[in-house]
């Protein structure tokens, strides 16, 4: 399934010096977002920096949203994760896409201009329509909380 997304290039290096967002493989769910920096940016341990991706998107339909997610290698190898853990882009947002990068590692980490820093995933959205009830239908799990379904 595909969905047309309007893309506005805010940094002219995108498409020339830096590739436009693209799926790395046919099975990729996320499009890589790049750091549109003028110079390398050193992020000290426990520091958070807001980094421009150089683009804005408009999803255009209320049944679609996008998320900005971390790149697994940056988090696992270098401790670089998203400062807000996940970014939610509503269908009617038209502003610039920014990435909050947090260095939760023990060493400084340098992000260079054009580095892949996050990924954008476009998702279908179902609008909830609440039905107020006195009791829920019985399920096997019931109201069991954290850890109630076991480890296996």
Swiss-Prot record:
Protein transport is among the record's keywords: no
Pathway in which this enzyme or protein is active: Pyrimidine metabolism; dUMP biosynthesis; dUMP from dCTP (dUTP route): step 2/2
Swiss-Prot/TrEMBL catalytic activity: dUTP + H2O = dUMP + diphosphate + H(+)
Domain of life from the UniProt record: Bacteria
GO MF, one annotated term: dUTP diphosphatase activity
InterPro entries (UniProt xref): dUTPase, dUTPase-like, dUTPase-like_sf, dUTPase_trimeric
Binding sites annotated in the UniProt record for substrate: 71-73, 84, 88-90, 98
Membrane-crossing residue ranges in chain numbering: none
Family indicated by similarity: Belongs to the dUTPase family.
Protein name as it appears in the record: Deoxyuridine 5'-triphosphate nucleotidohydrolase
Species of provenance: Coxiella burnetii (strain RSA 493 / Nine Mile phase I)
């Amino acid at each position: 399934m595909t969905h047309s997304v309007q893309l506005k290039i805010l940094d002219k290096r995108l498409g020339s010096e830096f590739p436009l967002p693209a799926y790395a493989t046919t099975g990729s769910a996320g499009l890589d977002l790049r750091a549109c920096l003028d110079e390398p940016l050193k992020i000290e341990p426990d520091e958070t920096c807001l980094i421009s991706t150089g683009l804005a998107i408009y999803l255009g339909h209320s049944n679609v949203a996008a998320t900005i997610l971390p790149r697994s290698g940056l988090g696992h190898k270098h401790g670089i994760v998203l400062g807000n853990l996940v970014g939610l882009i509503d269908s009617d947002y038209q502003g610039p896409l920014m990435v909050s990068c947090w260095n939760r590692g023990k060493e400084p980490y340098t992000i260079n201009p054009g580095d892949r820093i996050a990924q954008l995933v476009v998702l279908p959205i179902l609008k909830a329509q609440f039905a107020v009830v006195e009791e829920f239908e019985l399920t096997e799990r019931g109201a069991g909380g954290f850890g109630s379904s076991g480890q296996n």
